[in-house]
Amino acid sequence: MTNIHPTAIVEDGARIGNNVTIEPYAIVKKNVTLCDDVVVKSYAYIDGFTTIGRGTTVWPSAMIGNKPQDLKFKGEKTFVEIGEHCEIREFAMITSSTFEGTTVSIGNNCLIMPWAHIAHNCSVGNNVVFSTHVQLAGHVQVGDCVTIGSMVGVHQFVRIGSYSMVGAMSGIRRDIPPFTIGTGNPYALGGINKVGLQRRQVSFETRLALIKTFKRVFRSDESFQASLESVLEDFGEVPEVRHFVEFCRQPSKRGIERGVDCEASLEEPIDKKEGAFVES
């Protein structure tokens, strides 16, 4: 049963699904769609042509779908789409998009922690975690299963590849290749996100191929393009390696991050249970 508190403001025209809860003093504007089992907590504000997927919770004082912070915006009809079973925590802001018909999108099962900011024309994949105060500028693309630590700033038009992990307080100015881990301002790649991939049950053989790919691309004397070609020849049967190469070859407004933390070790066991080491 849907439960809307008497002090909540739900404008005529808003589409409210089954078993939705809207707590005291929340505001839901007329073009909003709340799917089944959504919870909107006290003082949350949802505006614009916003759709929030089933089972998602919007926590107190979060703001979704409000006017983008972009001087190019001239009142066009734009959209926000949030997937299922997400947690949009306190004071997070997800603005609407800029340019007619465009969308800010967030996938399923995402955790957006307090004070995070997702700007106009951003795209965020599934199973993503943004820690407190993560700040995305406009047009940023974030792949699936990405974790970004607290107080990270991401420059507009940057792409962050799937399964990567960005350390806290980093400054991201260039595209982050998938499956990598890094930190810093300026940012430095530390290697492959071994622990994250293991937790996602990526196989030992795949992790090994990715570590060798990283070493070839970022720690060899080959040119960048030549190293991408050679890893395809040697490890092209591994889908994750092909994805890594395709990401690095795609058109980019910012370029691929190639700064590497040379002190980061690639000799650690990538699976304690299997006990395997990768030689440097």
Swiss-Prot record:
One Pfam family matching this protein: Hexapep
Main location: cytoplasm
Catalytic function, reaction form: a (3R)-hydroxyacyl-[ACP] + UDP-N-acetyl-alpha-D-glucosamine = a UDP-3-O-[(3R)-3-hydroxyacyl]-N-acetyl-alpha-D-glucosamine + holo-[ACP]
Record localization: Cytoplasm
An example Gene Ontology CC term for this record: membrane
Enzymatic class: transferase
BP GO annotations: lipid A biosynthetic process
PROSITE patterns with a match to the protein in the record: HEXAPEP_TRANSFERASES (PS00101)
Pathway involvement of the protein, from the record: Glycolipid biosynthesis; lipid IV(A) biosynthesis; lipid IV(A) from (3R)-3-hydroxytetradecanoyl-[acyl-carrier-protein] and UDP-N-acetyl-alpha-D-glucosamine: step 1/6
Alphabetized PANTHER family for the sequence: ACYL-[ACYL-CARRIER-PROTEIN]--UDP-N-ACETYLGLUCOSAMINE O-ACYLTRANSFERASE (PTHR43480), ACYL-[ACYL-CARRIER-PROTEIN]--UDP-N-ACETYLGLUCOSAMINE O-ACYLTRANSFERASE, MITOCHONDRIAL-RELATED (PTHR43480:SF1)
Protein name per UniProt: Acyl-[acyl-carrier-protein]--UDP-N-acetylglucosamine O-acyltransferase
